[in-house]
Amino acid sequence: MVLKRKGLLIILDGLGDRPIKELNGLTPLEYANTPNMDKLAEIGILGQQDPIKPGQPAGSDTAHLSIFGYDPYETYRGRGFFEALGVGLDLSKDDLAFRVNFATLENGIITDRRAGRISTEEAHELARAIQEEVDIGVDFIFKGATGHRAVLVLKGMSRGYKVGDNDPHEAGKPPLKFSYEDEDSKKVAEILEEFVKKAQEVLEKHPINERRRKEGKPIANYLLIRGAGTYPNIPMKFTEQWKVKAAGVIAVALVKGVARAVGFDVYTPEGATGEYNTNEMAKAKKAVELLKDYDFVFLHFKPTDAAGHDNKPKLKAELIERADRMIGYILDHVDLEEVVIAITGDHSTPCEVMNHSGDPVPLLIAGGGVRTDDTKRFGEREAMKGGLGRIRGHDIVPIMMDLMNRSEKFGA
């Protein structure tokens, strides 16, 4: 009888990078000491993957949709809905959801799009104050997510989804006016303008910001709203398509939401924050535990992306080393003959760009049944030589499922 293996997909968010002078011309992944991933590279196979298509910078939402095997051009209906699912909200198809950043506004200019990366606890307290004190004449839900992130849901307003953002997407610029394309979205734009104004009044006087002022930290006195989203068009759940039980170990709301939308059970172990202070070993232990009961486990590690956005190459390398130790724990507790492991990023976040780019992402697959190549280390340049070649993100899961002996033959 053919062995049906388990699958473990590990995403190191924003993993891919470009050569950096500060790192002697290496990328953070090449600069980092990664004995466990290098061991897997030696016994596995490397390649590169374009989350969407070559040269196309991918959002974390569209990238994960693609990596889970979906066509984002067909399924994607905006980021906000995934954010809302990720914070545990069960929404209807009539609701309109948005991603929100707590930000710092000084003299009409956004000086910090993440309000000094305020903590999750601070964001949740500020969100509760806004929910309790702001009245805009329509039903809404405002809830803190991870770190500086929050979610806004306008109940019953899905027809106004053609509304723009007020986020200029870089510091040093004023907030944008909400654009709109029709009467429904014009109404939503007006509601959002009122919401932002009233929320700002609450934030300016909140004790958290009074304390941050005294401490010389950026205050969270403004809301940047983006990514209007309605119910995604998911034709078939991941679990139905592949006939597997699937679980995710995830801290970040957006990625939780994508996983929930396609049928994953989602777990967030204590100490897993999605921030620099996350407890990656708690994630490793949870993944090992879940592999006993689930056929396919997805583990998401966020901080590498944040270091790219913050242009901190040495920190990004250190975080990759932490992720490698996390992977080492997993390797000590699984039988590689019975598990197929894939490691990649959802996209590249080069430090010099401080944002997502269209660079391909290194990909490693190892475990039972995997053909090997001649690569010895996991890095961008080694990945170019790998036997997998250059594939698209949506090819990863089918390749894994085939190696797990869970794919069905096409044709007679």
From Swiss-Prot:
The Swiss-Prot or TrEMBL record annotates one GO molecular function as:
phosphoglycerate mutase activity
Question: What top-tier enzyme class does this entry carry?
Answer: isomerase
InterPro entries referenced in this protein's UniProt entry, alphabetically: Alkaline_phosphatase_core_sf, ApgAM_prokaryotes, Metalloenzyme, Pglycerate_mutase_ApgM, Pglycerate_mutase_ApgM_sf
Supply the EC number(s).
5.4.2.12
Q: Which keywords are on file for this protein?
A: Glycolysis, Isomerase
Query: Gene3D superfamilies of this UniProt entry?
Result: Alkaline Phosphatase, subunit A, Metalloenzyme domain
GO BP: any one term: glycolytic process
The source's superkingdom equals Archaea
Q: Which reaction does it catalyse?
A: (2R)-2-phosphoglycerate = (2R)-3-phosphoglycerate
Give the record's pathway. Carbohydrate degradation; glycolysis; pyruvate from D-glyceraldehyde 3-phosphate: step 3/5
A Pfam family in this protein? Metalloenzyme
User: Could you confirm whether the keyword Isomerase appears in this record?
Assistant: yes
Similarity comment: family membership: Belongs to the BPG-independent phosphoglycerate mutase family. A-PGAM subfamily.
This molecule's function is given as:
Catalyzes the interconversion of 2-phosphoglycerate and 3-phosphoglycerate.
Q: What is this protein called?
A: 2,3-bisphosphoglycerate-independent phosphoglycerate mutase
Origin organism is Pyrococcus horikoshii (strain ATCC 700860 / DSM 12428 / JCM 9974 / NBRC 100139 / OT-3)
